[in-house]
């Protein structure tokens, strides 16, 4: 604690926490502060990556746009290939000559399709390479920022449990969270681009334009469940940080080369092992409860989504049966339905990952805001 019972780090952490609504009328204020807090943390992470190297953000933007457009392009090419093949079959059945395969429309479409496949693989490999290189650079930059900050902070702060816990958490999260959040953010952008493309495709389906908004609407319960339980998971891990430290302490003691002799000499191995099991039991019980409840809700929403998908597939098949659309169109529209469902699900999970990651980055933000309070009597030589 600071002078007069003042704990600067705890106060800073409290400032980052959005107060829950006191009434229904207070909900808009709560949502506005929640969104502002989320984007504030996200912008902080983007700034960290930009300081590391502007080329990282520029590369990720380009890759995310290509990754979003390519699946839609692939679906359109597949549709054209199937429709072209259907036309060939119809001409054969009518006894009409279709000419040589080489130089035909089918052959040309296949060339474009395999060029697309090659380009898609190149984009995926480029994405992996940029992510790996950027991860190393960002980790180094954030670690250096923490080291510089640790040099400036008062020595007395290191004796405060609240401060040391934040320092430990910030140092641990620095290795993964910033680049993970950035990758997830641009992954969400690419999925959003794909989603818009698939919605446009379904909007062109005769008499089926309304299926796209329905598919998006039935995904809203999944989004609410996912975001709600990500927040609960974060709060649970925050409350149980003491348990995780104890488990790390007991497990590290058992494999510490400097302590193993004393542990054997005083017969403490079973004691530490039992203590680890006991602490893990309390930690695991609450975590399991959260996981089970979340997945029960997800199973219910998945069953509802599957039933609606089956109905839409049958409606599109009926259009083919009536001769209103072709086989390639059936492949395109059903693929768009499936892709919308999977893309929305992935978009929700990725967005929840970004949201959860920005919550954990509070540890780093709070630590970096800590100010020295002891004024030196002389200048540093």
Residue ranges and their predicted role:
Residues 1-71, 88-109, 123, 127-131, ...:
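Membrane-integrated ABC transporters
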Residues 21-30, 145-176, 240-275, 350, ...:
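Short intracellular "coupling" helices and adjacent cytoplasmic loop segments at the cytosolic face
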Residues 51, 169-181, 235, 239-242, ...:
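An intracellular "coupling" helix at the cytosolic face of ABC transporter transmembrane type-1 domains
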Residues 57-123, 195-233, 307-314, 318-328, ...:
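Transmembrane helix-loop-helix hairpins at lipid-water interfaces of multipass membrane proteins
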Residues 74-78, 115-159, 163, 229-238, ...:
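Juxtamembrane helix-loop junctions of ABC transporter transmembrane domains
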Residues 75-82, 143-147, 160, 164, ...:
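Alpha-helical transmembrane segments of polytopic integral membrane proteins
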Residues 239, 268, 312, 333-369:
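Cytosolic ends of transmembrane helices, especially the final helix of ABC transmembrane type-1 domains
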């Amino acid at each position: 604690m600071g002078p007069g019972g003042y704990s600067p780090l705890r106060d800073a952490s409290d400032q980052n926490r959005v107060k829950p609504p006191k009434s229904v009328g207070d909900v808009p204020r709560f949502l506005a502060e929640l969104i502002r807090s989320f984007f504030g943390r996200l912008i902080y992470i983007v700034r960290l990556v930009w300081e590391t190297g502007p080329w990282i953000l520029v590369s990720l933007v380009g890759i995310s746009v290509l990754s979003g457009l390519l699946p839609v392009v692939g679906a359109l090419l597949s549709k054209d290939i199937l429709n072209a093949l259907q036309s060939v079959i119809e001409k054969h059945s009518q006894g009409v000559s279709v000419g040589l395969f080489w130089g035909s429309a089918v052959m040309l479409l296949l060339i474009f399709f395999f060029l697309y496949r090659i380009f898609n693989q190149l984009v995926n490999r480029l994405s992996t390479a940029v992510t790996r290189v950027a991860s190393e650079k960002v980790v180094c930059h954030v670690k250096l920022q923490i080291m510089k900050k640790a040099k400036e902070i008062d020595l007395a702060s290191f004796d405060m449990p609240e401060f040391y816990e934040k320092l430990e958490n910030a140092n641990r999260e620095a290795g993964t969270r910033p680049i993970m959040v950035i990758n997830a953010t641009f992954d969400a952008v690419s999925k959003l681009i794909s989603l818009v493309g698939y919605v446009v495709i379904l909007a062109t389906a005769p008499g089926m334009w309304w299926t796209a908004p329905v598919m998006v609407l039935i995904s809203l319960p999944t989004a609410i469940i996912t975001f709600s339980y990500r927040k609960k998971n974060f709060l649970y891990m925050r409350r149980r940080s003491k348990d995780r430290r104890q488990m790390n302490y007991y497990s590290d003691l058992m494999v510490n080369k400097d302590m193993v002799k004393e542990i054997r000499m005083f017969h403490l191995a079973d004691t530490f092992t039992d203590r680890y099991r006991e602490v893990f039991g309390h930690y695991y019980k609450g975590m399991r409860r959260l996981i089970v409840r979340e997945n029960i809700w997800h199973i219910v929403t998945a069953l509802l989504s599957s039933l609606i998908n089956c109905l839409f597939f049958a409606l599109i098949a009926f259009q083919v049966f009536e001769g209103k659309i072709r086989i390639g169109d059936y492949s395109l529209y059903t693929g768009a339905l499936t892709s919308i469902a999977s893309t929305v699900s992935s978009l929700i999970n990725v967005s929840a990952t970004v949201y959860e990651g920005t919550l954990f980055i509070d540890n780093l933000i709070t630590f970096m805001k800590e100010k020295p309070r002891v004024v030196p009597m002389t200048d540093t030589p």
